From Swiss-Prot:
Its cofactor is [4Fe-4S] cluster. It is found in: Cytoplasm. Its EC number is 2.1.1.192. The gene is rlmN. This is Dual-specificity RNA methyltransferase RlmN. Disulfide bonds join C108-C350. It comes from Burkholderia vietnamiensis (strain G4 / LMG 22486) (Burkholderia cepacia (strain R1808)).
Length: 379
């Protein structure tokens, strides 16, 4: 039986786990063994960790847990996209999405319950900010998804070789602004990269930010993974409206931060994400302005057709307009992709499942009834 003050071992990266084992009087190699059991063999308890001394297993049973996020619902799209809704307590939920492709499998991971940045086109931002996720809640999304996907394919837990791994890429592009939860996100990403955990390369872990400039610099100094920047506008006036954080860190400051980051980045370009909004930011003139503002930053563009949601007041750009916009960028020699819409039959926009939970919670608070996450049957 664990004590009320037990620690969740998923909260520790390698350094933290060494320190914790040291506090139990154990040598550093025990931390490596423990980490492999947790993150490579999906161990849920300590009794099965047969290469750990029985005395250590007994210590751990009295002091520690391997506490996973609670799955509220699991949805599978006709195109293979899979979305989990994770209950993080107090009527809050976050989403984790797996996107299978022919040569890779990408997991989109959330870092916060809600988001304080409040981008105009983002469903999550409309919910407001509830709290930061813990390291355990962040890395737990990858652990949950990797082993659930392996089980669905009949693959056993074990060291994450290329033949066994299902999740080949992680993008910190789910709910929340990762750089506003830096102290929990970075240890989680260290585990993603650790060969004794998930063993992904820095090129295969991408953090997406709306432009928290000071933390971009810190990330570059401490853990430079691939970087994506949510740009969405080619000038400060429009970006102030679409991405309010721009008022604090305007485009000139943001572009300078991107240049600094590239000096240490695992890739030689920044990915700029650009949500295509009909009549707002999608003209050829906007595209030319975009080229001008990013001219000193080696980059590629990822154009994202807007996923409509209630109360946004926005419309997705027409396919032909997206094509014209993209062509301006391509003609200038900039690599440009248009994101495919995936999983429309299970959720039209990131944050909508969690938003429905939030709406039910608010209704419960008004009516005095108990809030509860209701499981949604997989499609």
């Amino acid at each position: 039986m664990t004590s009320e003050t037990s620690v969740n071992l998923l909260d520790f990266d390698a350094e933290g786990l060494v320190a914790y084992c040291g506090s139990l009087g154990e040598k550093p190699f025990r931390a490596k063994q423990l980490q492999r059991w947790i993150h490579q063999y999906n161990a849920g308890d300590f009794d099965g960790m047969t290469d750990l001394a029985k005395s250590l297993r007994e210590k751990l049973k009295g002091r520690a847990t391997i506490g996973m996020p609670e799955i509220a619902s699991d949805h599978v799209s006709a195109d293979g996209t899979r979305k989990w809704l994770i209950d993080v307590g107090n009527g809050n939920a976050v989403e984790t999405v797996f996107i299978p492709e022919e040569t890779r499998g990408t997991l989109c991971v959330s870092s916060q319950a809600g988001c304080a940045v409040n981008c105009r086109f983002c469903s999550t931002g409309k919910q407001g900010f509830s709290r930061n996720l813990s390291t355990a809640e962040i890395i737990g999304q990858l652990r949950m998804a990797e082993f659930a996907l392996r089980a669905s394919l009949g693959r056993a837990p074990g060291p994450n070789g290329k033949a066994e791994r299902v999740v080949t890429n992680v993008v910190m592009m789910g709910m929340g602004e990762p750089l506003l939860n830096y102290n929990a996100v970075v240890p989680a990403m260290r585990l993603m990269l650790d060969d004794n955990a998930y063993g992904l390369s820095r090129r295969r872990v991408t953090l997406s930010t709306s432009g928290v400039v000071p933390m971009m610099d810190r990330l570059g100094a401490e853990l430079p993974v691939a970087l994506a920047v949510s740009l969405h506008a080619p000038n400060d006036a429009l970006r102030d409206e679409l991405v309010p954080l721009n008022k604090k860190h305007p485009l000139r400051e943001l572009m300078a931060a991107c240049q600094r980051y590239l000096k240490v980045a695992p890739r030689d370009f920044i990915t700029f994400e650009y949500c295509m909004l009909d009549g707002v930011n999608d003209t050829e003139a906007h595209a030319r302005e975009l080229l001008a503002v990013t001219r000193d930053v080696p980059c590629k563009f990822n154009l994202i057709p807007f996923n409509p949601f209630p109360e946004s007041g926005l419309i997705r750009s027409k396919p032909e307009q997206i094509k014209r916009f993209a062509q301006v960028l391509i003609d200038a020699g900039v690599v440009t992709t248009v994101r495919k819409t995936r999983g429309d039959d299970i959720d039209a926009a990131c944050g909508q499942l969690a938003g429905a939970v939030k709406d039910r919670t608010r209704l419960a608070e008004r009516t005095g009834t108990a809030a509860k996450i209701i499981e949604v049957r997989a499609v």
